[in-house]
Amino acid sequence: MKRITLYAAGSAIIGAMLLAGPAHAMHISEGILPLGWAALWFAVAAPFLALGIRRVNELSRHDLSFKPLVGLMAAVVFIISCMPIPVPTAGTCSHPCGTGIAAILVGPLVSVVITTVALLIQALFLAHGGLSTLGADVVSMGVAGSFAGWFVFRGMRRLGAGLAVAAFVAGLLADWATYLTTALELSSGVRGSEPFYPLFLKIVAAFVPTQLPLGVLEGAMTAGMVVLLHRKRPDLLAKMGVVDAGGPGAGPRRATVVMLALFCLLASLLVAGPSRASEKWPGVDETVVEKIAAEHGREPRDPLINTDQGDLLLFVFLLAGTVGGFAAGYFWRMLVAERRTYDDHT
């Protein structure tokens, strides 16, 4: 377990080098949930995390390369879930989650472990989420997102869907499930004497303009990553149980081209900057989560570690560059160097 923690934590810090400022993403900030509700979500997350750790240990006993793969996936989830993407149609920024691709590749329980490590580092060093609300964030992004993506992917594959189509829908619904669960957590925790259902619908409606297009973008991104892995390293996907050894391929090439075109189109629309360079693009955490909480008397508290002071952020960036080099090398070896060895033996 010590080794997986080092792999996952070290690799996850890579994403810090991509952030020039506070992360504009969706997490429930420190202090927003009352103590009782925060404790409840910790209790919900705990058994999934325990089962996930046991699953990692079981799989790594049979495959020594599994823990490095978990570390690499932790870096992927960390980077994706910190990457602010502007949405011109909503005037806000948000982020994909990455749990759909993680659940497809390593399973939902292991994805919960990966998500917990990523969220913990974000809460400690990037003022992204909070320690008291870590349980709620793990449940929404780690549990709901991972299991939604995994069940949808497996179900669609059994119904005969192609690899690209199944991965697309899995990534899409994993993203939306995360935000639906966040709406559930926030409306339950801050409503006071207000009826639950109207507040829940209000929060969901506030998420829709941003997360509707971003969910489609994450679906296309998930499909692209799975298809790329299948074309470069089908043996890896077979070993992880994503595809059957010697089974059908990634599906019609037309579906792959459509997914890629959709990804490029949405990406170009989403990252199109505002006409005024000085215009600010607040994150969904500000426009939805913190705004709704403030309306109900819950204000976010300052993070435990303030990276805006001193040289801590510079240290994180330098460390990220070092770890990023090792992770990039491992990813290259997995996709290219080991692929050549695989081809030589087939």
Swiss-Prot record:
- UniProt signal peptide: 1-25
Does the keyword Transmembrane helix belong to this entry?
yes
Q: In which pathway does it act?
A: Cofactor biosynthesis; adenosylcobalamin biosynthesis
Which locations, inside or outside the cell, does it occupy? Cell inner membrane
Q: How does it sit in the membrane?
A: Multi-pass membrane protein
Keyword DNA damage in the entry? The reply is: no
Q: Which GO terms describe its molecular function?
A: cobalt ion transmembrane transporter activity
Q: Which InterPro entries match?
A: CbiM (IPR018024), CbiM/NikMN (IPR002751)
Q: Name one Pfam family in it.
A: CbiM
Q: A Gene Ontology CC term for this entry?
A: ATP-binding cassette (ABC) transporter complex
| Keywords from the named record | Cell inner membrane, Cell membrane, Cobalamin biosynthesis, Cobalt, Cobalt transport, Ion transport, Membrane, Signal, Transmembrane, Transmembrane helix, Transport
Q: TM spans, by residue?
A: 31-51, 68-88, 101-121, 133-153, 159-179, 196-216, 255-275, 312-332
Quaternary structure note: Forms an energy-coupling factor (ECF) transporter complex composed of an ATP-binding protein (A component, CbiO), a transmembrane protein (T component, CbiQ) and 2 possible substrate-capture proteins (S components, CbiM and CbiN) of unknown stoichimetry.
Q: What is the purpose of this protein?
A: Part of the energy-coupling factor (ECF) transporter complex CbiMNOQ involved in cobalt import.
Q: Which family does it belong to?
A: Belongs to the CbiM family.
Q: Which NCBIfam families match?
A: PRK08319.1 (NF006184)
Q: What is this protein called?
A: Cobalt transport protein CbiM
Organism expressing this protein natively? Geobacter sulfurreducens (strain ATCC 51573 / DSM 12127 / PCA)
